Curated annotation (Swiss-Prot):
It comes from Alkalilimnicola ehrlichii (strain ATCC BAA-1101 / DSM 17681 / MLHE-1). Disulfide bonds: none annotated. This is ATP-dependent Clp protease proteolytic subunit. Fourteen ClpP subunits assemble into 2 heptameric rings which stack back to back to give a disk-like structure with a central cavity, resembling the structure of eukaryotic proteasomes. Cleaves peptides in various proteins in a process that requires ATP hydrolysis. Has a chymotrypsin-like activity. Plays a major role in the degradation of misfolded proteins. Belongs to the peptidase S14 family. Its main location: cytoplasm.
Amino acid sequence: MSDERREGLAPEIEATGLVPMVVEQSARGERAYDIYSRLLKERVIFLVGPVEDHMANLIVAQLLFLESENPDKDIHIYINSPGGAVTAGLAIYDTMQFIKPDVSTVCIGQAASMGALLLTGGTKGKRYALPNSRMMIHQPLGGFQGQATDVDIHAREILDMRDRLNRIMAHHTGQDMETIARDTDRDNFMSPDTACEYGLVDAVLADRKALDQA
């Protein structure tokens, strides 16, 4: 039997809504992976859905694992997220900056709020959006009930976090703080071309050939 691997989707996943399984066959036998684990072998991470602590822990773990596997090879994060918790998103962002490999980011669908910050937090020159994706930036949301003094404490924390996020956005987009503060005062939606002009991404990709030329 040839050592060349043969891959195919396991038939039981058809029309079930379950995560597809990929079966690899070689001279050593068969092995089944869920599709995301198989793509992780190719250094592809999916950041999909609301950003929260459990999801952030999984993304951070995958980033650290891929760095340990090969610290000199790029990691690719595909983002389709409406945003979410600021602290969870910053855990992912800080890890992206901390590890040695370049981190390429690609917006598929949408990258809103914290999703947009993670998109623009990729390695300069390796941040992309697909043609029909959307990006949205805004200031952080928050609310608190309690004693007046505690409300004041939390209000000041939200303002401090807003400034921190604006500094990060300014650093990666090349926009000044005044522009970022103005443009994030309300929900600000961007097309891929507008996001590219703004500095959120570096290129809009219609196909893989465009990626080779980017």
